[in-house]
Amino acid sequence: MTDYKNGIKKLLQKCFSDKSIDVIFMSCNNLSPHKDYMIIDPETKYYIGYILTNGIKIPFIAEVWHNNTTRIYLDPRKNFYLALFIGDLNV
């Protein structure tokens, strides 16, 4: 699990390369606020947290698929996503 978290951090840092960020992970098991508009796949690993930059918290959900494709959704509290980054974790 730590390898996935490190990969997610690297991917986020690459996307915010011009800013200093901290990535904070929260519970991976509580997806209940997001289930209304997400298709939950039992084979996918989900990580919830937020990016902290310049005092601003940006929540995210990261999905790691069985083939290590990673999708990171920013501000998942909405019924739409403000941004989507796709990358591969090589773990």
From Swiss-Prot:
Spell out the InterPro entries in the cross-references. DUF5461
Tell me one Pfam family matched here: DUF5461
Q: What is this protein called?
A: Uncharacterized protein 91
Which organism does this record belong to?
Sulfolobus islandicus rod-shaped virus 1
